[in-house]
Amino acid sequence: GDIDTVGDVNGLRAMNKRRKALMEELLITCPESEQAMVRSFSCFAADGDCIYLGNSMPVRYWNSFAQTSIPTENVRANRGANGIDGQISGFLGVSARCSRSWALVGDLTAMYDSNALALLPQLDRGTRVLGVINNGGGGIFRTLPGADGQPETMRKLLVQPHAHSFKAIAEQWGMRYLTIRTAEDFDQLDSLEENSQTLVELIPDREQTEQIRLRLANAQV
């Protein structure tokens, strides 16, 4: 039906402006958080002609924290039947028509479909960068309302912890491997070679990530 009023639009704009200012402040304060790493990754990915986002947190993070100064028009995403399945396959399919393609997926997503990298030799030449957020077993279910108040036995059911590195996966399929733990480590992305295949493992600081999440969740803006 008809809507009589939309409320105080100017107030909503002011609130959004304050929230964005808080987000920018937190990204500077917590440079090793997942959110800040996504921002930095997006700055480098902006020079690509296509970007592929894995399901779940990568899409949410990109929507909230990716850079917006350089428009990125060709952004693709896909949700498998179980969410995480087929994501790397989807990225490789999208990259087949791109000269410089970037992807950002979670660790469980990458492990689930890592064998898709066997397709690399079948693809045309091009620069491909696969970013993997390794936070030790996913983390979206930690952000659910009420999750913080659950007993430890219940919280263990919300994640799938692991201690795996993605270096061996990169080596298995002939990819260059880079590890990023700090903001300075992103400088490695300045030296990407043309027609190279690179796996970038992002290892964020959990405390900084949680600090940003809680500050934004409790912000009175």
What are these regions (language model features)?
Residues 6-28, 110, 159-168, 174-175:
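Extended, charge-rich low-complexity interaction segments
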Residues 11, 21, 25, 36-37, ...:
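Acidic/proline-rich low-complexity IDRs
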Residues 1-2, 47, 64, 119-123:
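Solvent-exposed, charged interface segments at domain starts and junctions
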Residues 13-98:
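Active-site diphosphate/adenylate-binding microenvironment
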Residues 67-221:
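Thiamine diphosphate
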Residues 1-15, 120, 145:
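Glycine-rich, acidic loop regions that bind phosphate or pyrophosphate groups
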